[in-house]
Swiss-Prot record:
It comes from Austrelaps superbus. Its main location: secreted. The active site is at residue 48. It is found in: Secreted. Expressed by the venom gland. This is Phospholipase A2 superbin a.
Amino acid sequence: NLYQFKNMIQCANHGRRATWHYLDYGCYCGPGGLGTPVDELDRCCKTHDDCYIEAGKKGCFP
C-alpha cells in the first residue's frame, strides 16, 4: 500500500528526497512495472510488487 511504499522510500533514501519524487521512478517504483530494475531502490520496488502479485494469486489482498 502507499503507506508501506512511503516508509520503504524514506528508509532507502535516508530522507534525502521527498517520497513523491519516487512515484514514477525507474521501472518499478509507482504503478505498473516492466523491464530490468535500474538500481537497488528500483529492485526493492520490484520485490514489493512481486510480493503483492503472489499474495493476490493466493487470494490475499493486503
